[in-house]
Amino acid sequence: MEEEEVLEVVEDEKAGPAAAEKRGPTDTLGSAPAASGHYELPWVEKYRPLKLCEVVGNEDTVSRLEVFAKEGNVPNIIIAGPPGTGKTTSILCLARALLGPALKDAVLELNASNDRGIDVVRNKIKMFAQQKVTLPKGRHKIIILDEADSMTDGAQQALRRTMEIYSKTTRFALACNASDKIIEPIQSRCAVLRYTKLTDSQILARLLKIVEKEDVPYTDDGLEAIIFTAQGDMRQALNNLQSTYSGFGFINSENVFKVCDEPHPLLVKEMIQHCINANIDEAYKILAHLWRLGYSPEDVIGNIFRVCKTFQMPEYLKLEFIKEIGYTHMKIAEGVNSLLQMAGLLARLCQKTAAPAAS
Protein backbone atom coordinates (compact mmCIF):
# COMPACT_ATOMS: atom_id res chain seq x y z
CA MET A 1 0.00 0.00 0.00
CA GLU A 2 1.25 3.54 -0.80
CA GLU A 3 2.25 5.76 2.10
CA GLU A 4 -0.50 8.28 1.25
CA GLU A 5 -3.16 5.56 1.44
CA VAL A 6 -1.87 4.42 4.85
CA LEU A 7 -2.09 7.99 6.16
CA GLU A 8 -5.60 8.33 4.76
CA VAL A 9 -6.77 5.14 6.51
CA VAL A 10 -5.27 6.31 9.83
CA GLU A 11 -6.93 9.73 9.46
CA ASP A 12 -10.28 8.10 8.68
CA GLU A 13 -10.06 5.91 11.79
CA LYS A 14 -9.38 8.99 13.92
CA ALA A 15 -12.18 10.97 12.28
CA GLY A 16 -14.79 8.26 12.93
CA PRO A 17 -18.29 7.89 11.42
CA ALA A 18 -18.62 11.54 10.34
CA ALA A 19 -15.65 11.22 7.98
CA ALA A 20 -17.06 7.95 6.66
CA GLU A 21 -20.27 9.68 5.61
CA LYS A 22 -18.32 12.37 3.74
CA ARG A 23 -16.36 9.80 1.78
CA GLY A 24 -19.54 8.38 0.27
CA PRO A 25 -21.12 4.93 0.23
CA THR A 26 -18.61 3.23 -2.07
CA ASP A 27 -15.84 3.74 0.48
CA THR A 28 -17.67 2.54 3.58
CA LEU A 29 -19.32 -0.83 2.95
CA GLY A 30 -18.07 -4.22 4.10
CA SER A 31 -14.69 -5.04 5.58
CA ALA A 32 -12.43 -6.04 2.67
CA PRO A 33 -10.54 -3.54 0.50
CA ALA A 34 -12.85 -2.16 -2.19
CA ALA A 35 -11.94 -1.70 -5.83
CA SER A 36 -11.27 2.01 -5.21
CA GLY A 37 -8.34 1.10 -2.92
CA HIS A 38 -9.95 2.37 0.32
CA TYR A 39 -10.59 0.23 3.36
CA GLU A 40 -14.24 -0.05 4.31
CA LEU A 41 -15.60 0.99 7.68
CA PRO A 42 -16.83 -1.75 10.06
CA TRP A 43 -20.62 -1.71 10.22
CA VAL A 44 -20.41 -1.46 14.02
CA GLU A 45 -18.92 2.02 13.54
CA LYS A 46 -20.86 2.95 10.41
CA TYR A 47 -24.23 2.33 12.06
CA ARG A 48 -23.30 3.50 15.56
CA PRO A 49 -26.19 5.72 16.80
CA LEU A 50 -25.45 9.45 16.98
CA LYS A 51 -28.59 10.40 18.95
CA LEU A 52 -30.13 8.85 22.05
CA CYS A 53 -33.40 8.21 20.21
CA GLU A 54 -31.50 5.88 17.82
CA VAL A 55 -30.15 3.61 20.59
CA VAL A 56 -31.71 0.12 20.41
CA GLY A 57 -33.34 -1.37 23.52
CA ASN A 58 -33.31 -0.37 27.22
CA GLU A 59 -35.97 2.27 26.51
CA ASP A 60 -36.58 3.20 30.16
CA THR A 61 -32.91 3.85 30.88
CA VAL A 62 -32.35 5.73 27.62
CA SER A 63 -35.39 7.92 28.37
CA ARG A 64 -33.70 8.95 31.67
CA LEU A 65 -30.60 9.96 29.71
CA GLU A 66 -32.81 11.96 27.33
CA VAL A 67 -34.20 13.85 30.36
CA PHE A 68 -30.62 14.61 31.47
CA ALA A 69 -29.80 15.87 27.97
CA LYS A 70 -32.92 18.05 27.88
CA GLU A 71 -32.40 19.63 31.31
CA GLY A 72 -28.64 19.99 30.86
CA ASN A 73 -27.76 19.31 34.49
CA VAL A 74 -26.22 15.84 34.36
CA PRO A 75 -25.03 14.02 37.49
CA ASN A 76 -22.03 11.69 37.46
CA ILE A 77 -23.34 8.45 35.98
CA ILE A 78 -22.43 4.76 35.92
CA ILE A 79 -23.95 2.61 33.17
CA ALA A 80 -23.60 -1.11 33.93
CA GLY A 81 -24.57 -4.00 31.69
CA PRO A 82 -23.40 -6.80 29.38
CA PRO A 83 -21.12 -6.09 26.39
CA GLY A 84 -22.66 -4.83 23.14
CA THR A 85 -25.79 -3.26 24.64
CA GLY A 86 -24.92 0.37 23.87
CA LYS A 87 -23.38 1.68 27.11
CA THR A 88 -20.51 3.69 25.61
CA THR A 89 -22.62 4.71 22.62
CA SER A 90 -25.32 6.09 24.96
CA ILE A 91 -22.74 8.14 26.87
CA LEU A 92 -21.31 9.55 23.62
CA CYS A 93 -24.83 10.40 22.40
CA LEU A 94 -25.52 12.16 25.70
CA ALA A 95 -22.25 14.13 25.42
CA ARG A 96 -23.10 15.07 21.82
CA ALA A 97 -26.58 16.27 22.85
CA LEU A 98 -25.20 18.34 25.74
CA LEU A 99 -22.09 19.86 24.18
CA GLY A 100 -22.77 20.01 20.45
CA PRO A 101 -19.83 21.61 18.59
CA ALA A 102 -17.75 21.79 21.80
CA LEU A 103 -17.68 17.97 22.01
CA LYS A 104 -14.10 17.67 20.75
CA ASP A 105 -12.58 20.01 23.34
CA ALA A 106 -14.82 19.21 26.31
CA VAL A 107 -14.79 15.39 26.33
CA LEU A 108 -11.97 13.08 27.44
CA GLU A 109 -12.55 9.43 26.58
CA LEU A 110 -10.37 6.80 28.26
CA ASN A 111 -10.54 3.02 28.17
CA ALA A 112 -9.93 2.10 31.77
CA SER A 113 -8.79 -1.43 30.86
CA ASN A 114 -5.67 0.18 29.30
CA ASP A 115 -5.41 3.34 31.42
CA ARG A 116 -6.18 1.61 34.68
CA GLY A 117 -3.49 2.78 37.11
CA ILE A 118 -3.37 5.58 39.65
CA ASP A 119 -1.02 7.63 37.42
CA VAL A 120 -3.82 8.09 34.87
CA VAL A 121 -6.08 9.64 37.51
CA ARG A 122 -3.29 11.87 38.81
CA ASN A 123 -2.09 12.99 35.38
CA LYS A 124 -4.51 12.63 32.44
CA ILE A 125 -7.81 13.02 34.30
CA LYS A 126 -6.62 15.74 36.69
CA MET A 127 -4.98 17.78 33.92
CA PHE A 128 -8.10 17.60 31.76
CA ALA A 129 -10.33 18.58 34.70
CA GLN A 130 -8.12 21.63 35.34
CA GLN A 131 -8.27 22.86 31.73
CA LYS A 132 -10.45 25.88 31.01
CA VAL A 133 -12.92 25.30 28.16
CA THR A 134 -15.57 27.75 26.94
CA LEU A 135 -18.94 25.96 27.13
CA PRO A 136 -22.61 26.97 26.93
CA LYS A 137 -24.14 28.06 30.24
CA GLY A 138 -24.91 25.21 32.62
CA ARG A 139 -22.80 22.67 30.70
CA HIS A 140 -19.82 20.73 32.04
CA LYS A 141 -16.79 18.95 30.66
CA ILE A 142 -17.31 15.19 30.49
CA ILE A 143 -14.76 12.47 31.28
CA ILE A 144 -15.80 9.07 29.90
CA LEU A 145 -14.22 5.99 31.52
CA ASP A 146 -15.02 2.88 29.50
CA GLU A 147 -14.64 -0.53 31.21
CA ALA A 148 -14.24 1.25 34.54
CA ASP A 149 -14.54 -2.05 36.44
CA SER A 150 -10.98 -2.82 35.23
CA MET A 151 -9.52 0.10 37.20
CA THR A 152 -7.34 -0.79 40.16
CA ASP A 153 -8.60 -0.06 43.67
CA GLY A 154 -5.92 2.58 44.10
CA ALA A 155 -7.02 4.39 40.94
CA GLN A 156 -10.66 4.27 42.05
CA GLN A 157 -9.76 5.67 45.48
CA ALA A 158 -7.85 8.53 43.81
CA LEU A 159 -10.75 9.13 41.41
CA ARG A 160 -13.34 9.73 44.14
CA ARG A 161 -11.42 12.74 45.48
CA THR A 162 -10.94 14.11 41.96
CA MET A 163 -14.70 13.81 41.35
CA GLU A 164 -15.37 15.98 44.42
CA ILE A 165 -12.73 18.64 43.75
CA TYR A 166 -13.79 19.32 40.15
CA SER A 167 -17.54 18.79 40.59
CA LYS A 168 -18.32 22.38 39.51
CA THR A 169 -16.72 22.02 36.07
CA THR A 170 -16.54 18.31 35.24
CA ARG A 171 -18.88 15.33 35.10
CA PHE A 172 -17.80 11.69 35.03
CA ALA A 173 -19.52 8.96 32.99
CA LEU A 174 -18.42 5.39 33.72
CA ALA A 175 -19.33 2.33 31.64
CA CYS A 176 -18.75 -1.12 33.13
CA ASN A 177 -19.92 -4.73 32.89
CA ALA A 178 -20.31 -5.25 36.65
CA SER A 179 -21.14 -2.31 38.91
CA ASP A 180 -20.15 -4.28 42.03
CA LYS A 181 -16.49 -3.94 40.94
CA ILE A 182 -16.78 -0.17 41.33
CA ILE A 183 -16.01 0.86 44.92
CA GLU A 184 -18.95 2.03 47.06
CA PRO A 185 -17.73 5.64 47.49
CA ILE A 186 -17.78 6.15 43.70
CA GLN A 187 -21.17 4.44 43.34
CA SER A 188 -22.63 6.77 45.98
CA ARG A 189 -21.44 9.80 43.98
CA CYS A 190 -23.10 8.60 40.77
CA ALA A 191 -26.52 7.81 39.36
CA VAL A 192 -26.34 4.09 38.52
CA LEU A 193 -28.18 3.02 35.34
CA ARG A 194 -28.44 -0.63 34.32
CA TYR A 195 -28.63 -2.02 30.79
CA THR A 196 -29.89 -5.51 29.97
CA LYS A 197 -29.18 -7.78 27.01
CA LEU A 198 -31.13 -6.90 23.88
CA THR A 199 -34.07 -9.09 22.91
CA ASP A 200 -34.06 -11.14 19.71
CA SER A 201 -36.75 -8.93 18.18
CA GLN A 202 -34.73 -5.75 18.85
CA ILE A 203 -31.61 -7.21 17.21
CA LEU A 204 -33.67 -8.54 14.28
CA ALA A 205 -35.24 -5.12 13.63
CA ARG A 206 -31.79 -3.46 13.41
CA LEU A 207 -30.35 -6.28 11.27
CA LEU A 208 -33.23 -5.94 8.78
CA LYS A 209 -32.54 -2.20 8.42
CA ILE A 210 -28.85 -2.81 7.78
CA VAL A 211 -29.26 -5.65 5.26
CA GLU A 212 -31.71 -3.42 3.39
CA LYS A 213 -29.30 -0.45 3.31
CA GLU A 214 -26.31 -2.59 2.34
CA ASP A 215 -28.36 -4.67 -0.13
CA VAL A 216 -27.27 -7.93 1.52
CA PRO A 217 -28.92 -11.15 0.22
CA TYR A 218 -30.15 -13.26 3.15
CA THR A 219 -32.49 -16.01 4.27
CA ASP A 220 -34.64 -15.91 7.41
CA ASP A 221 -32.71 -18.82 8.96
CA GLY A 222 -29.48 -16.87 8.33
CA LEU A 223 -30.68 -13.93 10.43
CA GLU A 224 -31.96 -16.35 13.08
CA ALA A 225 -28.49 -17.93 13.22
CA ILE A 226 -26.87 -14.50 13.69
CA ILE A 227 -29.29 -13.69 16.52
CA PHE A 228 -28.62 -17.11 18.10
CA THR A 229 -24.84 -16.58 18.05
CA ALA A 230 -25.06 -12.95 19.26
CA GLN A 231 -26.80 -13.81 22.57
CA GLY A 232 -28.21 -10.30 23.05
CA ASP A 233 -24.99 -8.54 21.96
CA MET A 234 -25.63 -6.06 19.12
CA ARG A 235 -21.92 -5.57 18.42
CA GLN A 236 -21.46 -9.31 18.02
CA ALA A 237 -24.50 -9.51 15.74
CA LEU A 238 -23.22 -6.78 13.40
CA ASN A 239 -19.69 -8.22 13.33
CA ASN A 240 -21.06 -11.69 12.49
CA LEU A 241 -23.32 -10.23 9.80
CA GLN A 242 -20.48 -8.31 8.15
CA SER A 243 -17.99 -11.19 8.44
CA THR A 244 -20.44 -13.63 6.84
CA TYR A 245 -21.29 -11.20 4.03
CA SER A 246 -17.61 -10.41 3.37
CA GLY A 247 -16.64 -14.09 3.35
CA PHE A 248 -19.55 -15.64 1.46
CA GLY A 249 -21.67 -12.80 0.00
CA PHE A 250 -24.85 -14.51 1.24
CA ILE A 251 -26.37 -14.81 4.72
CA ASN A 252 -27.75 -18.25 5.51
CA SER A 253 -27.39 -20.42 8.61
CA GLU A 254 -24.70 -22.64 7.08
CA ASN A 255 -22.45 -19.68 6.24
CA VAL A 256 -23.09 -17.99 9.60
CA PHE A 257 -22.01 -21.07 11.57
CA LYS A 258 -18.90 -21.42 9.37
CA VAL A 259 -17.89 -17.91 10.41
CA CYS A 260 -18.97 -18.10 14.07
CA ASP A 261 -17.77 -21.69 14.47
CA GLU A 262 -19.80 -22.94 17.41
CA PRO A 263 -21.73 -26.22 17.81
CA HIS A 264 -24.58 -26.16 15.29
CA PRO A 265 -27.92 -25.91 17.13
CA LEU A 266 -29.53 -28.41 14.74
CA LEU A 267 -26.97 -31.04 15.75
CA VAL A 268 -27.53 -30.20 19.41
CA LYS A 269 -31.30 -30.37 18.86
CA GLU A 270 -30.95 -33.81 17.29
CA MET A 271 -28.81 -34.94 20.24
CA ILE A 272 -31.46 -33.78 22.74
CA GLN A 273 -34.16 -35.57 20.73
CA HIS A 274 -32.17 -38.82 20.98
CA CYS A 275 -31.94 -38.29 24.76
CA ILE A 276 -35.73 -37.83 24.93
CA ASN A 277 -36.07 -41.10 23.00
CA ALA A 278 -33.62 -42.71 25.49
CA ASN A 279 -31.27 -43.52 22.59
CA ILE A 280 -27.88 -43.05 24.26
CA ASP A 281 -25.84 -44.53 21.39
CA GLU A 282 -27.06 -42.04 18.75
CA ALA A 283 -26.81 -39.12 21.18
CA TYR A 284 -23.22 -40.07 22.02
CA LYS A 285 -22.29 -40.29 18.32
CA ILE A 286 -23.27 -36.63 17.88
CA LEU A 287 -21.40 -35.62 21.04
CA ALA A 288 -18.26 -37.48 19.88
CA HIS A 289 -18.55 -35.75 16.48
CA LEU A 290 -18.70 -32.31 18.14
CA TRP A 291 -15.74 -33.25 20.34
CA ARG A 292 -13.66 -34.31 17.30
CA LEU A 293 -14.43 -30.95 15.68
CA GLY A 294 -12.52 -29.37 18.57
CA TYR A 295 -15.32 -27.58 20.42
CA SER A 296 -14.67 -27.00 24.10
CA PRO A 297 -17.05 -28.47 26.70
CA GLU A 298 -18.12 -24.89 27.57
CA ASP A 299 -19.20 -24.30 23.96
CA VAL A 300 -21.15 -27.56 23.82
CA ILE A 301 -22.85 -27.28 27.22
CA GLY A 302 -23.75 -23.63 26.57
CA ASN A 303 -25.50 -24.51 23.32
CA ILE A 304 -27.20 -27.56 24.87
CA PHE A 305 -28.75 -25.22 27.46
CA ARG A 306 -29.83 -22.59 24.92
CA VAL A 307 -31.40 -25.19 22.63
CA CYS A 308 -33.06 -27.02 25.54
CA LYS A 309 -34.73 -23.78 26.73
CA THR A 310 -36.74 -23.52 23.49
CA PHE A 311 -37.12 -27.25 22.76
CA GLN A 312 -40.68 -28.58 22.50
CA MET A 313 -40.99 -31.15 25.30
CA PRO A 314 -43.13 -31.66 28.42
CA GLU A 315 -42.47 -28.93 30.98
CA TYR A 316 -41.57 -31.32 33.83
CA LEU A 317 -38.99 -33.00 31.58
CA LYS A 318 -37.49 -29.67 30.49
CA LEU A 319 -37.01 -28.72 34.15
CA GLU A 320 -35.22 -32.01 34.85
CA PHE A 321 -33.01 -31.58 31.77
CA ILE A 322 -32.04 -28.01 32.67
CA LYS A 323 -31.20 -29.09 36.24
CA GLU A 324 -28.83 -31.81 34.96
CA ILE A 325 -27.30 -29.42 32.39
CA GLY A 326 -26.70 -26.90 35.20
CA TYR A 327 -24.93 -29.46 37.41
CA THR A 328 -22.69 -30.53 34.52
CA HIS A 329 -21.93 -26.90 33.62
CA MET A 330 -20.87 -26.29 37.22
CA LYS A 331 -18.46 -29.27 37.14
CA ILE A 332 -17.02 -28.12 33.80
CA ALA A 333 -16.53 -24.59 35.13
CA GLU A 334 -14.62 -26.04 38.09
CA GLY A 335 -12.20 -27.68 35.65
CA VAL A 336 -13.55 -31.22 35.21
CA ASN A 337 -14.09 -30.71 31.49
CA SER A 338 -13.59 -34.16 30.00
CA LEU A 339 -15.61 -36.02 27.40
CA LEU A 340 -16.61 -38.41 30.19
CA GLN A 341 -18.49 -35.59 31.99
CA MET A 342 -20.43 -34.79 28.82
CA ALA A 343 -21.21 -38.47 28.21
CA GLY A 344 -22.40 -38.73 31.82
CA LEU A 345 -24.79 -35.84 31.16
CA LEU A 346 -26.29 -37.64 28.14
CA ALA A 347 -26.69 -40.82 30.22
CA ARG A 348 -28.55 -38.92 32.96
CA LEU A 349 -30.79 -37.20 30.39
CA CYS A 350 -31.64 -40.56 28.80
CA GLN A 351 -32.32 -41.97 32.26
CA LYS A 352 -34.94 -39.25 32.88
CA THR A 353 -37.01 -40.45 29.92
CA ALA A 354 -36.26 -44.18 29.83
CA ALA A 355 -38.97 -46.59 30.90
CA PRO A 356 -38.32 -48.12 34.36
CA ALA A 357 -36.63 -51.52 34.25
CA ALA A 358 -38.89 -54.51 34.82
CA SER A 359 -38.45 -56.02 38.29
Curated annotation (Swiss-Prot):
Entry keyword set: ATP-binding, DNA replication, Nucleotide-binding, Nucleus
Gene3D superfamilies tied to this protein: 1.10.8.60, 1.20.272.10, P-loop containing nucleotide triphosphate hydrolases
A GO BP annotation: DNA-templated DNA replication
Top-level taxon in the UniProt lineage: Eukaryota
Sites where the protein binds ATP: 81-88
Annotated region described as Disordered, given as residue ranges: 1-35
Main location: nucleus
Biased composition (Basic and acidic residues): 12-25
One CC-aspect GO term: DNA replication factor C complex
Compartment(s) where it occurs, according to its Swiss-Prot or TrEMBL record: Nucleus
Bias type Acidic residues, positions: 1-11
GO terms, molecular function: ATP binding; ATP hydrolysis activity; DNA binding
Its biological purpose: Subunit of the replication factor C (RFC) complex which acts during elongation of primed DNA templates by DNA polymerases delta and epsilon, and is necessary for ATP-dependent loading of proliferating cell nuclear antigen (PCNA) onto primed DNA. This subunit binds ATP.
Quaternary state and interactors: Subunit of the RFC complex, an heteropentameric complex consisting of a large subunit RFC1 and four small subunits RFC2, RFC3, RFC4 and RFC5; the RFC complex interacts with PCNA. Forms an heterotetrameric complex with RFC3, RFC4 and RFC5; this complex has ATPase activity but is not stimulated by PCNA. The heterotetramer of subunits RFC2, RFC3, RFC4 and RFC5 interacts with RAD17.
PANTHER family associated with the record: REPLICATION FACTOR C / DNA POLYMERASE III GAMMA-TAU SUBUNIT, REPLICATION FACTOR C SUBUNIT 2
Family recorded in the similarity comment: Belongs to the activator 1 small subunits family.
Entry protein name: Replication factor C subunit 2
Source species of the chain: Gallus gallus
